[in-house]
């Protein structure tokens, strides 16, 4: 039984210490997700015994990471000066994320081009743990040479509609590490709340971080009458960034502009189009798109420069600043004499060009701080900067990716048709209102697995501009971690394989077998995934409700 592979650390530590003995024959084939680029396993023979744990080389800094990963998977470790069981070597030819792994009855060898490659090798290792013929934990004889197909393998977390405490974000990061995701895109500002601490502008969180109420869960047309507020502290953000980095994950911050700006404008009304009739900004209490956009003024650009400076300090390792750029209504700019004057002053033909002007001004600020701009595919409207990276989300606009690639821009594929994990997962789901989704589009794990990120017809020389793919998890109807897990798993495992495994090795039937073998791990971690067989939540006792902040 695969459940034997999940060994509590307390049990493993009770075994008598007798290192280095080969295991009894291992009969189980590894069931890794994502599937490696090249894997050879010898089953039915003695493997490497984990009965007494693993000896790690004391002098190698990678041993600290190995110690953590083994411990988290119930495998005892000890640091030794010599006679270590694992040998770490560096091989630059494997690239930043590639690795080579070999397991014999006597030793484990890991070669990698970087720390990240070694982390992936260790995750492949713990996913290969099986019970030998005696029921003891062991590794089969293995030879793996592996590297990812795409460099961007991401999940997006929306903390604006509903925010999760840091402890829950850490659980998400742990699961991302296991399945070799390397990017957490953190959506921190929107119409319904500003969650990002900016010391120079405290009202962004004290005012912009609080809405008077939210739609009732299960009835989107009715307000619940309960205030919802909260934000992350600078220390909490640094803690998340550090925790993610230790797991090979880069956190990309998003600050929405010029639209989805209601919360910021409610906090500092002078940032909006104050010269329009009926100007009355507030933090929005309903979902959807709202009309408040930043005014294209020097005051706004100074504000955004200050915000970007603090964001760069909070996220020093992120090569990008995500500026949103999506769903920016032009109505207020059309009504605003000041916005119209800005168009005339800068020779802009329409409001779409005004948005491009706005984004280019912001991009100069971002670039001057050593970062790159990334935004949703609407940043293409009115003209796309040649150095911007574009996230393609509108599947009904199939030419947007092609046009960006033709211009030489990098793209990340996040099509709502395949990768909006807030969408319904299929016809089988709990009837309880708390399992309501934003729409009834049936987006199954099979649908996710069928995604080909490189747009059809992309010339071979342009394929490298497709950095990868990412699932977006908007949280209008996801108030806490149990609901987030139900929406994301097992679809995230399908995406992990899409983003990592060579296209020619993908096989849905084989993936389903390996998926079933991963479920005991998710059960052991208390993940409230959607059961593939009947759609029920894996943790039926989980409470789906808003946590107050």
Language model features with spans:
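Acidic, contiguous N-terminal accessory segments
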Residues: 20-151, 367-376, 380, 517-525, ...
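Flexible, acidic glycine-rich loops studded with aromatic residues
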Residues: 372-388, 394-549
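Flexible loop/turn segments at secondary-structure boundaries
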Residues: 163-165, 191-197, 258-264, 328-333, ...
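Bacterial N-terminal signal peptides that target proteins for export
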Residues: 1-7
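Active-site neighborhood of glycoside hydrolase catalytic domains
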Residues: 266-270, 282-388, 394-403
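Bacterial N-terminal signal peptides
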Residues: 8-17
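Feature activates predominantly on carbohydrate-active enzymes
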Residues: 94-320, 361, 365, 470-475
